[in-house]
Amino acid sequence: MAIFVNSRKQKFNIMKKLFLILLTCVTVLQAKAQISQAAYERWHQSKYSMFIHFGLYSELGGVWEGKPVTRGYSEQIQSFAGIFSDWYGDTALRFNPTQFNADEIVALAKEAGMKSIVITTKHHDGFCMFKTATTDYNSYDATPAKRDFVKELADACQSGGIRLGLYYSIIDWHFPQAYPISSHNCDFVTPQHQKFSKAQVTELLTNYGPISELWFDMGSNTPEQSKELYQLVHKLQPDCMVSGRLGNDQYDFSVMADNKYPEGVLQSAWQTAASMFDETWSYRSWQERGDVHVKTMEKLRSLINVVSHGGNFLLNIGPKGDGSVVPFEKEVLKGIGGWLKKYGYAIYGTEASPFRELFDWGTTTRKGTELNLILS
């Protein structure tokens, strides 16, 4: 898996490539000037993390009134199925995910070789998976479960020695002073909505221990609104990385479009977020899942592709409405974890391939003067 360079000509070529890498590093340092070097390195060197989409939509499982909703992501079923807010909200009355076990999820992430977990604290539907003083529309006050799932996962991550990140949707279809549901999810943010978001972000960064990243999503903030949220995050937790979807160049790392991958090395800190199936992020009861081995190899190649281009890979699971992890997704993660136990040295703590050309046989990663050849 490793080659060493000895000839003078090869050393000269490597030095040229390392000079280009140095320029890349300078650019990255400029992009992350708001956070410490140590915080950036912890995030950048982890390479591989778990994304969890879990909420009221998990209870519906991509089905409304007995019929599969085939349009759009299942976590946005309220929008794509045209469900009235009151009807959708009634889902909370039966949402009681007794099989959600934060310790087991942390154990699965560690077995999969993942270094952190990012969970949806609130998606576009506005339903909060944490106990909040800002609204009763949350998993503690509005459901028979009466549980703070973010707290449970935060505690499990702390005891399990794995970092926690939080997804937070700026779009909020439940907040009365927010723009109503739209087809593009890029609505402007009213002053009242901004105040509401800041209050929730303050809770999330105050009540749940160290947070490795805050994964903002959607909405069209003004430059001032983005700046306010970015500065709030770093005031409360200076080492918390902020995702590029906050907008207006207020970020610590950029995020590719859903399930998209760059063709080359990007000149900044970046991440690809990927779902098991492109059609949805949350649980879909009628999803055709196919062969476990085929899916495992697909996502493993995606991980290698991202890391060889200098990025981090955030791979999603969508627990069922009862809180259990779909067995298919569990087996995929375990399969990737098995490969990483053998060859993780070619992934963790590495830098992007110094080569700009693509190879038929696979790709490379770099650690110091050592090149790792990963055959595909």
Task: Describe the residue ranges of each PLM region.
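Bacterial Sec-dependent N-terminal signal peptides
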Residues: 1-34
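Mature catalytic domains of secreted/periplasmic carbohydrate-active enzymes
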Residues: 33-376
